[in-house]
Structure formats: C-alpha cells, structure tokens
C-alpha cells in the first residue's frame, strides 16, 4: 500500500494542533467573603473578642437547641451587639440536659420541671405546648375503613 507523502505531512501537522480547546477551571466557592464583611462590620463597632466562652446554646421555640461546641464570641457593649461565630448543631433538649443543668438559673426551674414530666410521661418534649390539644379532633383510622366513613 503506497503512502502519499502530502497526506502524511498534513496528518502530522494536524496532530500537532491542540484538540478540544482550553480547559475552563471550576470556580471555588469561598465563604470568606461573608466572614470578611462580618469582621469589617464588627471592626467598625470596635468589638472585642471574649475568650472565656467554650460553648453556646440557643434555645428555639420548637424545643430544639442550636449548640455551638467551639464558638467565637465578639462583643461591642456600647452598641449592644454580640456576634457568635462557629458551626452550630441542631440538637434535642434531652440530649443536652446533663450539660445544660449547671448553666441554667432559678428562672428556668419551671421549664425543667415541665420537661421532666414530659419525659416521665413518655412524650417527646416540646417547649411551646400550644399544640397539645390539636390532635383531639382527628379521628383514628381502623384498617379496612375509608377516611370519609370515620366520624
């Protein structure tokens, strides 16, 4: 089989060219921009770092707790501003009871008593308690019955 020298030269030139174009690099998502804006705002308020805080707990109305294991706290008392930075974990109150008890004061004894009663009754604890009687109007379904037939 004879080889045509013109076609061979053309193929060698084509092989030297780059095929596919330039690779586009993926952009990295940086959360540092938000942190720098926050730090700039706190710098304008002359916030100082509070070193004595090891952990922080924020109680939500639904009975959950935002728990910061390692927390950074900055405070600007003259502007009534505190900033908590870190990675929160959403936990149930019952998971944190042994750690929370020494931190709670006398004003929270009523909440603790209600929580203990709910745990003893076998219910899941909820801080609100406003939806306790809402399930009384809902009928129980029995196997084989349709929803419309139950009164």
From Swiss-Prot:
GO terms for biological process: protein transport. Residues 32-97 form the NAC-A/B domain. It is found in: Cytoplasm; Nucleus. Keywords: Cytoplasm, Nucleus, Protein transport, Repressor, Transcription, Transcription regulation, Transport. Signal peptide: none annotated. Pfam families: NAC. GO terms for cellular component: cytoplasm; nucleus. Residues 122-151 are annotated as: Disordered. It comes from the Eukaryota. Component of the nascent polypeptide-associated complex (NAC), a dynamic component of the ribosomal exit tunnel, protecting the emerging polypeptides from interaction with other cytoplasmic proteins to ensure appropriate nascent protein targeting. The NAC complex also promotes mitochondrial protein import by enhancing productive ribosome interactions with the outer mitochondrial membrane and blocks the inappropriate interaction of ribosomes translating non-secretory nascent polypeptides with translocation sites in the membrane of the endoplasmic reticulum. Part of the nascent polypeptide-associated complex (NAC), consisting of EGD2 and EGD1. NAC associates with ribosomes via EGD1. Belongs to the NAC-beta family. This is Nascent polypeptide-associated complex subunit beta. It comes from Meyerozyma guilliermondii (strain ATCC 6260 / CBS 566 / DSM 6381 / JCM 1539 / NBRC 10279 / NRRL Y-324). The lineage of its organism: Eukaryota, Fungi, Dikarya, Ascomycota, Saccharomycotina.
